[in-house]
């Protein structure tokens, strides 16, 4: 495989491109290499060879080092600690952080050769949520050091105005449902769940991370477009009762590898029949972005750049609170509602 380069008898150096940046992963055993290959295949993290785009820092120092079957270092006593999403605990002294995830350990900013180091709790099942969570945290930390900042959001582009639209929210907020409805209505799409933000001069761009969409049975049942194209039984089962599918095989609309967001919807399920949309001030929009990006404060080595990107995103966009009602289970209603805020 072209992404793998031998470093030592048991170590492989793997080079990837993501959101126009290069990241090097050092897998220190064969199982770790297989994990990276299989999990990265589900994201827009593409194997490549060494290129002229690689800086001296990137080529000489891996962004991630991962291994199994090796005892992790002891977490220093007395460090500050806090709970993180997914059931883990982060320990930090302000410069170095350790994330404990069910016995697996992710070290960020440890003064060794890799920016992020991973010790898995044995050879976990490759498709297990536990292992995916470990690799996700490691990748997000490494990408922050490449000035790419993760955001839980769907992303689409209005076919008439060309505006990039982000549908932001945690799991269970309705962002995947609305993203699917808009893609079914002919809006170009990037992702329904996780994206990366980057600064290109004064402009902020959004890039998709996860390749597949994931929906609930309720969303599928309410979407005539999806039901005419596929059976729920043929979609791969996911945690929390969701099913995933490849959007390029489902929608007639076009996939885009990035967009410039100009409209932000912070989605939450309201349970009412009709949705409500409330305009947010720039300060309220920034506060909500920070709540959705806790590592903009937790990871001090990247906090200044992270907050600067969020601030630039606020300046180029308009933010809204979306109290999602049952009416968004209808494709036409969803498209008309969002279009009323993205078109003059």
Stretch-by-stretch model annotation:
Residues 192:
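Active-site flanking residues adjacent to catalytic metal/cofactor-binding acidic residues
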Residues 175:
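Conserved lysine of the Walker
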Residues 188:
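Residue-level detector of anion-binding/catalytic polar loops
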Residues 1-171, 184-185, 195-344:
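A noncatalytic interaction/capping subdomain that flanks phosphate/NTP-handling catalytic cores
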Residues 178-179:
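Post-Walker A alpha-helix
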